[in-house]
Amino acid sequence: MRRWNRAAARVAIAVGLVSGAVAVHAQNTAVRINVNAAADRHPINSNIYGVAYASTEELNDLNAPLNRNGGNNTSRYNWLQNGDNRAQDWYFESIGDASAVAGERGDTFIADAKAANAEAMLTIPLLDWVAKLGSNRSKLASFSIAKYGPQTGNDWQWFPDAGNGIWTSGQYVVGNDPNDANVPSSSAFQQAWVQHLISQWGTNASGGLRYYILDNEPSIWHSTHRDVQPTGVTMDQMLAKVLDYAGMIKNNDASALVIGPEEWGWSGYFYSG
């Protein structure tokens, strides 16, 4: 009999709790939300829309106002040789464009954008090294297998000597010479390119290039570009670079718009490399 009484009591308590919960919810007042889609309307700035590496035809089809030249390889673009280093994306190879004309890549990109009444956005390298080409514009490798030994991967089809920078032990190749496939870069080196762009197209105020992007994904340089930047850049170092290069650009074209740092994700703005 006691067991039955205890069980009945538990049921009664449970029912009471449920009833209480229902009663509490029943006391909530209804909320009514009205949205007036016609109120406080304003035009959306068209420059929130853009694409990357679009052709003139694609820009016209999409009616896109911005066209971005960016990505990992642009961090190592050498405007004098018109080539870049593909970094971790492709065996850390320095590869030349089809044209040997200095700055041709940027000039063609701007011309294609202007033909579609779009604005070009060019990436200016901030890394301390940019690509170097071999004789007759031949490829060069940052992690030559002949020089640094067997590695876990290589460009077996197109450039077999170009390794992936990982020894067969699984460890990263360390102590490599950046000069193997690169040359030093600085704001003075990049200033010559900015001045070339201004001489070709004018200042932003006179219809030239409007947007200069400060490099690409600096918080992961030590991964993407570990052949020339094996340690992570600190926030203080990045700030110094931004001030240096942005100041250089504005000194040459006060009307230019400088964008950066161009990061890979939100965490790049909170954590150093």
What is each stretch, according to the model?
Residues 10-20:
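Bacterial N-terminal signal peptides
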Residues 28-273:
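N-terminal catalytic cores of secreted or lumenal carbohydrate-active enzymes
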Residues 1-7:
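N-terminal secretory signal peptides that target proteins for export/translocation
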Residues 23-26:
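Boundary at the C-terminal end of the N-terminal hydrophobic targeting segment
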